[in-house]
Regions:
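Transmembrane alpha-helical segments that form the functional core of multipass membrane systems
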Residues: 55-205
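Active-site proximal loops enriched in glycine and acidic residues that flank catalytic Cys/His/Asp
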Residues: 43-45, 124, 147-149, 170, ...
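Generic detector of intrinsically disordered, low-complexity, polar/charged segments
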Residues: 147, 159, 166, 210, ...
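Hydrophobic alpha-helical transmembrane segments of membrane transport and translocation systems
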Residues: 175, 180-298
């Protein structure tokens, strides 16, 4: 049996489009999850391992965030969240504005969009569906081919298909740009099942936007938010790291420096909350003297660490 079969048997909400467990084939990510207090599941004969419980924030994290310095890893992770919103909302937002809310656009942009739709015989919704389905076909066909051929086939096929569709007057150039940006944004999501969920919900938002405009789009987003708020993974709320202001938030949307990760995340409820001691740069000018003064006045840093270690020891006992 594969780990995906085990996941369907033990997850809390099997009918939800959102995954509730992390799955990975990278040893570094698996070991990092174990060190944070997560439970790892390895199936004999399967290259994929499971980590539980899962939450929405963990699906936007990549091991490369920690291998780069935090001035680079932090913005890249924040960019992934922005790309996830674009991949979910951008086509539906374009359809809603084009059909119902043209007054929101500048005059020149509104005239350009209206002029690009003149030779197209289909409504905006049909245009978006045609391009989205074509993009999904190219993506699935490239996955089934060998890696070098599949990547080349994906890029070349998308370029040729978009150019041919515009030349034939089946879609507008602006729609090709919207779908292309959406496809690029969806590729930035590191967790594949989360990307699949966003791709599925994008079609639902397209229909709601074509029906009620921005009101339909907001209703769809509110339904998704309510669903995410009701989800749990082994009893842990799906939005747990984002619901409460905790110290672990420094590693959710933005990756802070590694030397500030003194505590483990709270939601797995690990027995030992202390991940590492408070880091002091004793070799830096003036820092060693300041640390000695603090320790002489009452051992602020050591006392705090000792208290944390005592609490963690009591929890373990």
């Amino acid at each position: 049996p594969d780990s995906g079969l085990i996941e369907e048997f033990i997850e809390d909400y099997p009918y939800s489009p959102f995954p509730q467990m992390q799955y990975t084939e990278r040893p570094d990510r698996f070991c990092a999850g174990l060190s944070e207090g997560l439970v790892g599941i390895i199936v004999d004969g399967s290259p994929m391992a499971l980590l539980a419980p899962g939450n929405l924030a963990s699906f936007f994290q990549s091991p490369e965030d920690y291998y780069e310095r935090f001035p680079y890893g932090g913005p890249l992770r924040a960019l992934r969240y922005v790309a996830g919103v674009i991949a979910l909302v951008f086509p539906a937002l374009y359809v809603a504005i084009s059909l119902f809310h043209q007054e929101m656009l500048p005059t020149k942009l509104a005239l350009a969009i209206a002029g690009s739709h003149v030779p197209v015989p289909f409504p905006v919704l049909v245009e978006a569906l045609l391009m989205e389905v074509a993009l999904e076909l190219i993506r699935e066909s490239s996955v089934r081919l060998p890696d070098p051929v599949g990547q080349t086939m994906g890029f070349v096929g998308a370029l040729l298909l978009g150019d041919a569709a515009v030349s034939a007057g089946l879609v507008s150039p602006i729609m090709v740009i919207v779908v292309a940006v959406t496809g690029l944004a969806s590729f930035t999501i590191p967790h594949y099942p989360t990307g699949l969920a966003i791709r599925l919900l994008r079609f639902l938002l397209l229909f709601s936007s074509a029906w009620l405009g921005l009101f339909g789009l907001m209703a769809g987003l509110m339904a998704i938010a309510l669903h995410l708020g009701a989800l749990t993974s082994f009893g842990v709320p799906y939005l747990e790291p984002l619901m409460k202001p905790r110290p672990s938030l420094r590693d959710v949307v933005w990756r802070s420096p590694v030397f500030t990760f003194n505590k483990r995340p709270e939601y797995p409820e690990p027995l030992d909350q202390v991940r590492q001691k408070k880091f002091i740069r004793t070799w830096a000018p003036g820092v060693a003297e300041m640390a000695r003064k603090e320790s002489g006045e009452g051992g602020g840093g050591d006392g705090e660490d000792g208290e944390d270690r005592g609490k963690s020891g009591d929890g373990a006992r």
